[in-house]
Every structure is written in structure tokens, then in C-alpha cells.
Regions:
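Signal-peptide-cleaved, periplasmic/extracellular N-terminal interaction regions immediately downstream
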Residues: 2-3, 24-182
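Bacterial N-terminal signal peptides
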Residues: 7-21
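Flexible glycine-/small-residue-rich
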Residues: 56-58, 77-79, 115-117, 137-141, ...
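Hydrophobic anchor at the start of a short beta-strand
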Residues: 62, 225-226, 361-364
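Short, solvent-exposed loop/turn elements at domain surfaces
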Residues: 63-65, 84, 192-196, 281, ...
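Catalytic-core regions of hydrolytic enzymes
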Residues: 153-306, 317-329, 385, 389, ...
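Active-site-adjacent mobile loop/cap segments within catalytic or ligand-binding domains
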Residues: 312-411
Length: 411
């Protein structure tokens, strides 16, 4: 298999043109461009697919999509210096016939894989390492018709920086039960952070769809006001998600996810509340993966974590924690009656997105994309509706519980 020499590519009026290699200027949040490090790129042909690994000097945002006529897979990065990149590393995959790399637009770099057959990304993950980060992609063959249906440039994928303003005015919070319950639904990931991916299903897409359906269920029921942290394929930093909840004086913050495990056979829904120490090692790693999204987006969370820590110290949590516990209990009770939950349905971990001290906050893993059964559930409209109704009933039950608690503790 012959590969062309590594080259830069640019787009003008929709037409790709080939340029000679040149250095790229640093852009956006990174001190320097990510370098292709060590072994650079490796591809292992498995016969029924291929595994691609790209070693970088630091983690960067990325997105993947496919194109037809001819068959191509495109991987955008923010941002990579391709100096020294050797495309010969791809000569072990029959599905890949050529590779081109270069600048895409200011702040972004692109890799284009020419394909000999239709393939899909079965799993995608960028893992931090001591040397930087490695992007792992698992490719598998798919039918021509499926490839065509999934292909196309993602027009709505955007990236919001941490400093972008949230145009929401302050709203006064009222006692629980004295008015509509104001619920902030947080569909995890989005934009350049797709979350977990399995069999062509992206966590960001599935959670957005579920959040929109859950919003509709709550609004139709009456007694709820619902705000989504994102309503399209947009990347929203963790701090911004928290800011949205506080800006609208949320009564409840519910973050929705569907993670994937590299090992084990875990399945079923799991509910997480905030704790400094995770329930177990798996919960700790899960929190690290979720929080890594902002790192991948080039956002420095160190100062923000200090701010959040100060808020946690300054604000009384003696009221919020019991309310969160009662909310978690209500959710587990209703969900267990309606859908299958994990053998440990409620756990704790240090998710940054739950660190709003004055808003009861829950992270709900609706299932594991690494579980075929859970994947089937997440794409099943009937299952999603059943889960949404259970959450609606749990929120209603929690309102009654809080009203009773308020009456009993009234001076």
C-alpha cells in the first residue's frame, strides 16, 4: 500500500489544496501546539476492523466525522503541529489508503484518512499519560448505506470558551413547594467533547435527546420550569454549567450521562452525589473522565476549582446536603421501579459539575454505552419515556417530602 508524503491541507471555497509543510502558530488556550510524540501514530489491522493510536504531547479537543464521494474519515484537533509526522505508520490497515494532515482554520488542525471501505468509529477516547495524551480509535466496517446516513460535516458542533458570558439574569429562589419546581437539566458533553462512543452512538447526542424528552415530560406534567445547559451540539465548560444553575436560581440540578467502561460488564443506571472521596476506584476514574472534558477543551480549571472550593467553604451546606440526599433517595426509589439500575444504584464521587453548594445536584448515569443492553435501552424511545416519567415522579415526590420537612422544622 502506497502513501503520499505528509503534507499540509487548507480549505478555500470548499476545495482542498495541498501545500508544503510549514510551522503553525500557537492558538487559543495552549501555551504551545501539541506535538506528535514518541511513536506518533500507529494502526493495527484486526481483520474485522482497525485500532488507531495517536500520541500527542498534550491533550487537545477533537472531533471525528466521515464524508462520502470519496470515502473519508476526518479528525479535527485544536491544535497539532504535524512536524515529523510519518504517514507510513498507517500502512498496516487495509481500510486506510492515504493520510493527509495540516492546518484547517485558525486554531484547528485536521487529519484526513482516505478509506477503501466504509468504516465507523466503534470507540473513541483520549487518555492522559505521563508524556501527554493518546487518542485511541477503534474502527469497524459498516454497510454502505449506514456510512452514507452518518456522513456529513457537523454544522452545529461549536466550542464555547470558559470566559463566554452566560446571558441569564438573576432569578429569585422561592421555597420548595410554593411555586413551580425550577429544574436545570445538564446533558453531558457536547460539541468537541462527544463523551463515550460505541457502535456509532455518541454519549453527547444520546443525553441531549433524553434531556429534551425529559424536559417535555416535565413541562406537560405541569408544576415544573425547565432550563437546559445546552439545547444543541455545543461544548459547555463545567463552570458554565454550574453558573447557569445558579443564575436561574435552580431548585434542582440534574446532570445526565451514559459512560463506557474499558473493562468489566457493568450495566444499569447509577446515581451520584458529591463527595470528596469516591465510593470506589471506578467512581473516582469516572469523575476524572467527566472533569477531563474541560482539560481537553484547553480550559484551565485550577483557578475555578479554587473559586468553587471557596464557595463550598463560605456557604452553609448543612441545608443543601440533606436535601440532596432526600432527592437522591426519591430518584433511586422511583427509577428502581421502572428501569434496571446498577447493583450499587447510588454512589458518591467528586464531580466538579456537582459543586454548586446551594443547589441540590445529582449526576445520573442512565446506563453504560459499553453494555449492549444499555445501548439498546438508550436508543429505545419507549425506554427513555419510561425513565423520564420515573424522574418526573421522583421530583414530584421530593417536592412533597421537602414541604413536609419545612412544616416540621418551622419555628
Amino acid at each position: 500500500m502506497q502513501f503520499p508524503k505528509a503534507c499540509l491541507i487548507t480549505a478555500a471555497l470548499g476545495v482542498w489544496s495541498v501545500l508544503c509543510p510549514q510551522s503553525l502558530a500557537a492558538q487559543d488556550s495552549f501555551v504551545a501546539l501539541a506535538q506528535v510524540g514518541g511513536d506518533g501514530a500507529r494502526v493495527v489491522d484486526r481483520g474485522d476492523g482497525a485500532t488507531l493510536s495517536l500520541t500527542l504531547s498534550q491533550p487537545v479537543p477533537y472531533r471525528i466525522f466521515t464524508l462520502t464521494d470519496p470515502l473519508r474519515m476526518v479528525i479535527d484537533f485544536a491544535e497539532v503541529d504535524w512536524t515529523g509526522f510519518n504517514p507510513i505508520a498507517f500502512d498496516q490497515a487495509a481500510a486506510i489508503t492515504a493520510v493527509r494532515v495540516g492546518g484547517f482554520r485558525p486554531g484547528w488542525s485536521r487529519m484526513v484518512l482516505d478509506l477503501s471501505e466504509p468504516v465507523a468509529v466503534n470507540a473513541a477516547q483520549m487518555l492522559r499519560t505521563d508524556e501527554g495524551a493518546t487518542l485511541h480509535l477503534s474502527l469497524e466496517p459498516i454497510a454502505d448505506t449506514v456510512f452514507a446516513e452518518r456522513s456529513g460535516v457537523p454544522e452545529t458542533a461549536r466550542f464555547a470558551l470558559a470566559g463566554d458570558p452566560v446571558e441569564l439574569g438573576p432569578v429569585a429562589r422561592v421555597p420548595i413547594g410554593s411555586g413551580p419546581l425550577r429544574v436545570v437539566l445538564d446533558p453531558g458533553h457536547g460539541g468537541i467533547d462527544p463523551g463515550a462512543e460505541r457502535d456509532g452512538q455518541r454519549e453527547s447526542d444520546l443525553m441531549l435527546a433524553f434531556a429534551q424528552e425529559l424536559r417535555d415530560v416535565l413541562v406537560r406534567a405541569g408544576g415544573f420550569e425547565v432550563v437546559l445547559t445546552r439545547d444543541d451540539d455545543t461544548f459547555v465548560p463545567l463552570e458554565t454549567r454550574i453558573s447557569i444553575a445558579r443564575a436561574v436560581a435552580a431548585d434542582v440540578f440534574l446532570s445526565l450521562h451514559a459512560d463506557a467502561l474499558s473493562e468489566g460488564q457493568a450495566h444499569g443506571a447509577t446515581l451520584y452525589t458529591l463527595a470528596e472521596r469516591a465510593t470506589d476506584e471506578a467512581s473516582l476514574k469516572l469523575a476524572e473522565r467527566h472533569d477531563r472534558a474541560d482539560i481537553l477543551a484547553g480550559i484551565d480549571l485550577s483557578d475555578q476549582d479554587d473559586v468553587i472550593a471557596a464557595v463550598l467553604l463560605d456557604m452553609a451546606r448543612t441545608e443543601t446536603e440533606p436535601r440532596t440526599d432526600r432527592l437522591a433517595d426519591a430518584l433511586v426509589t422511583r427509577l428502581q421501579k421502572s428501569i434496571e439500575m446498577h447493583k450499587r444504584p447510588r454512589m458518591e464521587a467528586g464531580f466538579s459539575v456537582l459543586k454548586s453548594a446551594d443547589v441540590p445536584s445529582i449526576l445520573l448515569e442512565l446506563g453504560f454505552l459499553s453494555s449492549p443492553k444499555d445501548r439498546a435501552n438508550l436508543v429505545d424511545p419507549e425506554w427513555r419515556h419510561t425513565a423520564a416519567q420515573a424522574i418526573r415522579d421522583a421530583l414530584g415526590a421530593w417536592v412533597e417530602i421537602e414541604r413536609d420537612v419545612a412544616l416540621k422544622t418551622r419555628p
